Design a protein with these regions (language model features):
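Short, low-complexity N-terminal intrinsically disordered segments enriched in polar/charged residues
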Residues: 20-46
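Exposed beta-sheet edge and beta->alpha loop/turn motif
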Residues: 91-141
């Protein structure tokens, strides 16, 4: 079971959200966004690629076509998301009308990874529209 650090992350999000000038709506959506990402990671941990695929945006679903192909891509390209040891939510950022959730993941070997989840809101709620691996801060290990 992975450890989520919501209390520390919530304080950080509150402070960073105010500092980054997030709108009240964006700040309110932060918890919903974190819930979607957490649910997808839980699905990967359970090898439930169908549930994980459901959290992907229609664009991502069109690109990969099937839950199985999507799961293979994540397993091979984002192993730290497939089997994280620890997940910590960092800041939520609003840029160009889009919301991005930064997430720090510790992999099974103890290495830290910073991922930026691009989120899109649709009729059925928030979906993950892409994930980008960012370089961690110097000395973060």
């Amino acid at each position: 079971m992975i450890r989520f650090r919501p209390a520390i992350a919530a304080l950080f999000l509150l402070v960073s959200g105010v500092a980054l000038g997030l709108t009240p709506a964006a700040r309110a959506d932060s918890q919903s966004i974190r819930d979607v990402i957490s649910s997808q990671i839980d699905a990967f941990l359970a090898d439930d690629v169908v549930a994980a695929f459901d959290h992907a945006s229609p664009t991502i679903q069109r690109i990969f076509g099937t839950p199985e192909r999507f799961g293979e891509m994540v397993q091979q390209g984002y192993p730290m998301v497939w089997r994280p040891a620890e997940v910590t939510f960092l800041s939520t950022e609003e840029r160009g009308g889009r919301l991005f959730q930064n997430v720090m993941v510790r992999d099974a070997d103890g290495a830290l990874h910073i991922l930026e989840y691009e989120m899109i809101e649709g009729a059925s709620g928030w979906k993950i529209d892409g994930v980008r691996l960012r370089a961690p801060a110097a000395g973060a290990a």
